[in-house]
């Protein structure tokens, strides 16, 4: 079956199943191309919460499909590749988080959405890279537990005087971008602003001309007068950047910026998931209700 045939078959199945296809900005180009909506974790969470579709096909990783199930329990949520996990999300367990909470009684837990549903259920509020600063600034407490991304936590800490108890988690893909590589690129391309994701190492973030979520990158590059940009996030973002700003050049800061989990989902996987209506991701009510509380608190706060 050719890619074009696959795409038209997927479109037909989406219509037949009254399904919506959500794709994260880091997905393969051809998957983003057929998506009804592409976006970052926050945009896709909002979409999952408000869609009229009966079925949500989530092209992303496991925690994202869980978030869709938490926010839209009446929908069928399909994750074409059940093995598409997130190493960062796996770096925090419910048991370890409970231990930290016991050591710091009364200190609220702010959890990055890159976490399991069970961890969200132990949290006071969630955040994404697009709203993290506003989420933390909205809290009256003077100290917080921030999990699981130490890099995002370090970045947010710059904008507040709160005391942070940082979890020692990180994104292996973003962590691979080294400051010395960025310095060389900036020297070789002095006209190109370096735009990076706050999941990058703090030493890389210090070199950035602009730090933002993936959605923030699209907006920044569109509005900027610059014609060339050095991009410090996962390679999947390039497809939409080039589509939205075809007259501009985008230099990926490192060939190592590829997330193997985000690249697992193929058009064949999407087709099979729709055809067989499996694998389904469903969060149990006992976890869903407290996790939804943390997500709802986040969704009430405007994004950056």
UniProtKB/Swiss-Prot annotation:
Source domain of life is: Bacteria
Cofactor: binding details: Binds 1 [4Fe-4S] cluster per subunit.
Residues involved in [4Fe-4S] cluster binding: 86, 171, 259
Q: Where does iminosuccinate bind?
A: 24, 41, 112-114, 129, 197-199, 214
Q: InterPro entries, from UniProt? A: NadA, NadA_sf, Quinolinate_synth_type2
Alphabetically sorted, this entry's keywords are:
4Fe-4S, Cytoplasm, Iron, Iron-sulfur, Metal-binding, Pyridine nucleotide biosynthesis, Transferase
Q: Which family does the UniProt entry place this protein in? A: Belongs to the quinolinate synthase family. Type 2 subfamily.
Purpose: Catalyzes the condensation of iminoaspartate with dihydroxyacetone phosphate to form quinolinate.
This chain belongs to the protein called: Quinolinate synthase
Give the organism, scientific name.
Answer: Geobacter sp. (strain M21)
């Amino acid at each position: 079956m050719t890619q074009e045939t696959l795409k038209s078959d997927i479109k037909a199945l989406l219509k037949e199943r009254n399904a919506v296809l959500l794709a994260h900005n880091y997905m393969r180009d051809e998957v983003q191309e057929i998506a009804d909506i592409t976006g970052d974790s926050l945009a896709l969470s909002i979409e999952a919460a408000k869609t009229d579709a009966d079925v949500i096909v989530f092209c992303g990783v496991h925690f994202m499909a869980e978030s869709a199930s938490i926010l839209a329990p009446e929908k069928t949520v399909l994750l074409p590749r059940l093995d598409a996990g997130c190493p960062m999300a796996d770096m925090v367990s419910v048991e370890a988080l409970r231990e930290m909470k016991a050591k710091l009684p009364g200190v609220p837990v702010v959890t990055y959405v890159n976490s399991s549903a069970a961890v969200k259920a132990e949290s006071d509020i969630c955040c994404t890279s697009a709203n993290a600063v506003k989420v933390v600034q909205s809290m009256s407490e003077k100290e917080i537990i921030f999990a699981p991304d130490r890099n995002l936590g370090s970045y947010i800490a710059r904008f507040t005087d709160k005391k942070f108890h940082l979890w020692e988690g990180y994104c292996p893909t973003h962590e691979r971008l080294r400051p010395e590589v960025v310095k060389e690129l900036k020297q070789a391309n002095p006209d190109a602003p370096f735009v990076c994701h706050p999941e990058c190492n703090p030493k890389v973030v210090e070199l950035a001309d602009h730090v933002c979520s993936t959605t923030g990158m699209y907006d920044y590059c569109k509005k900027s007068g610059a014609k060339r940009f050095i991009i410090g996030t996962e390679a999947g973002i390039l497809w939409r950047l080039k589509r939205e700003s075809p007259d501009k050049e985008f230099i990926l800061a490192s060939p190592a910026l590829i997330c193997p989990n985000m690249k697992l989902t193929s058009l064949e996987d999407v087709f099979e998931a729709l055809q067989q209506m499996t694998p389904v991701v469903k969060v149990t009510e006992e976890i869903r209700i407290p996790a939804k509380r943390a997500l709802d608190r986040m969704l009430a706060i405007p994004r950056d």
